[in-house]
Amino acid sequence: MINNKTVAEGRYYIGLMSGTSADGIDLALVDFTDKGQQPRLVASFYQSYSAIIADKITSLYQPGSNEIDRAFHLDVELAQLFSQAINALLNQEKLTPEDIIAIGNHGQTIRHRPSGDNPFTLQIGCCQTLATLTGIRVVGQFRRKDMALGGQGAPLVPIFHQQLFTQTTAANFVVNIGGIANITFLPTRDSNQAVLGFDTGPGNALLDDWFTKHHPNSDDCFDKNGAWATTGQVIPLLLEQLMQDDYINSAAPKSTGREYFHLEWLEQQLTAFKEATHSQHETVINHNADIQATLLAFTAQSISDAIMALTAQGKVYLCGGGVHNKALVEALSSRLTASDTVFEINTMQALNIDGDILEAMAFAWLAYAFDQGLDSNLPAVTGASASCTLGSAFLP
């Protein structure tokens, strides 16, 4: 535990999350003062990104020209936006920087390469700039020590989910459907199974990319409620091809990101599919909405297959932006309640937890764990060689 005057005087932690969907900044104001109790969400705040900022972020998901300059100019620019959002939250709650123990800053992932030689991960949104502009200590760079210990550096949220389900008598899954989808498996208390978690594949990423490409003048950058997808028909042969992807079929521990599942990846898949079906004199893609319907089925199947590979029954709690895609939730629910499986499906709201802010709460907890000297990774999840306290501190 650190010995710092700021820690002694403050009461709350702020968790900051900017996800791979690149839609905005999520903030969670969290109280951990009741030892042994679940963390209490005091307030939340959301600030959407402008189209210009979102484009700057997504353009860095793939290698390109002048990317070092672009990345580190954006590193500072995002920190400035983060600080504005923090100040807006403080004003909303009539708090001052002295009321905050620390900010747990995930930042914005622009590249995540956990495999191969010299694996690395890069999150921008400069912690030092954020600390200086807000006058609040920042804990960030949470993924790097886990990777230094041979882990994937992701996912990090399962250990926080474990804190929320301490009294579970049934197997529970937390399914976060962001740009990338990930699951946490929380076995029953009397089970000898370990908590597991991994990225299953694309969540909203490909759905958003394909929608935006074909609706450039839409006010939305996503397929609201999956409405467009529902006008199309799933293409079974294309779905089968997508499900054969190497990442989908790789074993955990594993993690991925937008540098893998992106529009260019999809275009390559479609080109290969059209060539294969053309050689068989088949025409199976009639409308772009058919591809959207197939992508929705791909997300639902990759998630459901991962869940059913671990157990045949349990409770599934959904969170993340994908929860608001009605068609996607229905497709996932249909798969999990078919055949011989017995799953009860809810959103995190059933537990009185705002699923939209859950990841931000997790990074508030990671900052708290840093201050308490608690282990905050799960080697069974990330593949790290040891448990450790994650993060680094940046003083104002």
From Swiss-Prot:
Q: In which pathway does it act?
A: Amino-sugar metabolism; 1,6-anhydro-N-acetylmuramate degradation; Cell wall biogenesis; peptidoglycan recycling
Q: Entry's SUPFAM superfamilies?
A: Actin-like ATPase domain
Q: What is catalysed by this protein? A: 1,6-anhydro-N-acetyl-beta-muramate + ATP + H2O = N-acetyl-D-muramate 6-phosphate + ADP + H(+)
Family matches, as InterPro entries: Anhydro_N_Ac-Mur_kinase, ATPase_NBD
**Which keywords does this Swiss-Prot/TrEMBL entry list?**
ATP-binding, Carbohydrate metabolism, Kinase, Nucleotide-binding, Transferase
Q: Does the keyword Ribonucleoprotein apply?
A: no
Recorded hits in Pfam families, A to Z, give: AnmK
Q: Name one GO molecular function term.
A: ATP binding
Q: Which EC numbers characterise this protein's activity in its record? A: 2.7.1.170
Q: Does the keyword Kinase apply?
A: yes
* Binding positions (ATP): G19, T20, S21, A22, D23, G24, I25, D26
Question: Which terms under GO biological process does the entry name?
Answer: 1,6-anhydro-N-acetyl-beta-muramic acid catabolic process; amino sugar metabolic process; peptidoglycan turnover
Which HAMAP family does the entry mention? Answer: AnhMurNAc_kinase
Q: What PANTHER family does the record point to?
A: ANHYDRO-N-ACETYLMURAMIC ACID KINASE (PTHR30605:SF0)
State what this protein does: Catalyzes the specific phosphorylation of 1,6-anhydro-N-acetylmuramic acid (anhMurNAc) with the simultaneous cleavage of the 1,6-anhydro ring, generating MurNAc-6-P. Is required for the utilization of anhMurNAc either imported from the medium or derived from its own cell wall murein, and thus plays a role in cell wall recycling.
The record, for NCBIfam families, names: PRK09585.1-3
Family per record = Belongs to the anhydro-N-acetylmuramic acid kinase family.
What is this protein's record name? Anhydro-N-acetylmuramic acid kinase
